């Protein structure tokens, strides 16, 4: 009996989420426009406001699966640009996108990414990474901050002066401390909450110029 009650509660919660997801304007638009996820519109809006990703650039997309940011960035850099995507999860192939499956913290994966960069320089690092949330900020926030720190470390190791990091953060404990630390290495940090971010979401995107 207890199990059935628990399942009913989960079913109600799942049904509510599914209804919101189906009714979501950006979900419907993504399906119409051929993007793999509604997150595509977040990067599109960010780039409309910053114009950081341009034709011919080299961009690395961290935590790229399922690939909507890679779709957008690939379109923005064009045929003469390079888009390298990496994730520990598999990702279906995309035209003109080099996907490297693995943990970019591991030397062999990092070296593989940089080998694809070749003699070019990395112009922009993207990170839409987020942990599997538990619904408990005491657990979720430290996990998110760790991913942010990994993205910052990668950006510092690969970006030249003037290069940019576009990174998702969850507003909460640790964000101000991280921002202060980043100010020592980045000349400018800007915050943007795109229209495609759900209003109740704590997510924010930082645009940091090295």
UniProtKB/Swiss-Prot annotation:
Disulfide bonds: none annotated. It catalyses: uridine(2552) in 23S rRNA + S-adenosyl-L-methionine = 2'-O-methyluridine(2552) in 23S rRNA + S-adenosyl-L-homocysteine + H(+). HAMAP family: RNA_methyltr_E. S-adenosyl-L-methionine binds at residues 67, 69, 87, 103, 128. It is an enzyme of class 2 (transferase). It comes from the Bacteria. The keyword Transferase applies. This is Ribosomal RNA large subunit methyltransferase E. InterPro entries: RNA_methyltr_RlmE, RNA_MeTrfase_FtsJ_dom, rRNA-MeTfrase_E, SAM-dependent_MTases_sf. GO terms for molecular function: rRNA (uridine-2'-O-)-methyltransferase activity. GO terms for cellular component: cytoplasm. The active site is at residue 168. Belongs to the class I-like SAM-binding methyltransferase superfamily. RNA methyltransferase RlmE family. The keyword rRNA processing applies. It is found in: Cytoplasm. Its main location: cytoplasm.
């Amino acid at each position: 009996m207890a199990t059935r009650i628990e399942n009913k509660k989960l079913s109600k919660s799942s049904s509510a989420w599914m209804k919101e997801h189906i009714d979501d304007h950006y979900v419907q638009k993504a399906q119409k426009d051929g993007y793999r996820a509604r997150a595509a519109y977040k990067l599109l809006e960010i780039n409309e406001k910053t114009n950081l990703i341009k034709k011919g650039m080299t961009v690395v997309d961290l935590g790229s699966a399922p690939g909507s940011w890679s779709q957008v960035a690939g379109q923005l850099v064009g045929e003469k640009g390079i888009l390298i995507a990496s994730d520990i999860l598999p990702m279906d192939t995309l035209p003109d996108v080099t996907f490297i499956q693995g943990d970019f913290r591991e030397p062999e994966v990092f070296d593989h990414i940089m080998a694809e960069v070749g003699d070019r320089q990395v112009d922009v690092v993207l990170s839409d990474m987020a942990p599997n949330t538990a619904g408990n900020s005491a657990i979720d926030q430290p996990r998110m901050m760790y991913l942010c720190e990994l993205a910052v470390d990668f950006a510092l190791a690969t970006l030249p002066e003037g290069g940019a990091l576009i990174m998702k953060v969850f507003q909460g404990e640790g964000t101000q401390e991280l921002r202060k630390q980043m100010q020592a290495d980045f000349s400018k940090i800007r915050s943007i909450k795109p229209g495609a971010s759900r209003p109740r979401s704590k997510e924010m995107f930082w645009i940091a110029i090295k």
